[in-house]
Design a protein with these regions (language model features):
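Enzymes that bind and transform nitrogen-containing heteroaromatic metabolites
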Residues: 1-216
Length: 216
């Protein structure tokens, strides 16, 4: 059976995105530097060879630990699930060929027809909850895994429901001082076991297996 996982970049102080990176603050000059902060958070991804080639940003790029993690994550993912806030922001920012190349199920109250993009990405809009989205994802994942792409609220919902098998944090050397906390509202009933730690010049990658039960 497909595993359910997430892999996200987090700041050293535990935030998933910088303050102001949402539609509510679009155009607000107070938060105009969020793009630069987001770039720092993802400095381990953006220059890698696999990322650049996959998104058709040009040849070349960095190889090594970060590149291997990006490629492995992309190849193991057969379908993604994301929240509406992540989709709303991405709809404005992603290139025409969205960077998933798989089906994507969007958690939303909005009724909308599937949105087909070049390159193999089709966004499907799910109105009846996280378990329905997961059932639909399993039906199309094949022998690959299911990634909870974000944002924080979607990840938290799946963690609280006991539906996540493993996750990896790419901890970047940047402080945000605010924004959505990745594990806000997650209690002791979500237990984790450390599986692997890998370091690169840009981030520390920590992988955990998830189990139900109080954390020791």
């Amino acid at each position: 059976m497909s595993k359910v996982f997430f892999l996200v970049s987090v700041s050293l102080d535990g935030y998933l995105t910088p303050p102001g990176m949402d539609m509510a603050h679009a155009g607000d000059p107070t938060y105009e530097d969020w793009g630069a902060q987001w770039g720092k958070l993802h400095s381990w991804i953006l220059p890698t060879r696999f990322f650049r080639e996959t998104l058709k940003l040009g040849e070349g790029g960095e190889t090594g630990t970060d590149d291997q993690i990006v490629e492995h994550t992309f190849r193991r993912t057969g379908v993604s699930i994301m929240g509406k806030r992540m989709f709303d922001l991405g709809e404005r920012m992603w290139p025409e060929e969205a960077p998933f190349h798989t089906p994507v199920f969007v958690l939303t109250s909005q009724v909308r027809e599937p949105w087909v993009r070049p390159g193999g990405t089709t966004f499907h809009f799910v109105n009846d909850g996280i378990e329905s989205a997961l059932r639909r994802a399993r039906a199309v994942a094949g022998d690959r895994d299911i990634r909870i792409a974000g944002g924080a609220d979607a990840i938290q919902q799946y963690l609280r429901a006991g539906l996540v098998d493993e996750f990896t944090l790419a901890i970047s050397p940047v402080m945000f001082g605010g924004g959505p906390r990745l594990f806000a509202g997650i209690g002791r009933d979500v237990g984790v076991d450390l599986v692997e730690t890998l370091a690169s010049p840009h981030a520390t990658h920590v992988r955990y297996a998830v189990h139900k039960g109080a954390m020791s």
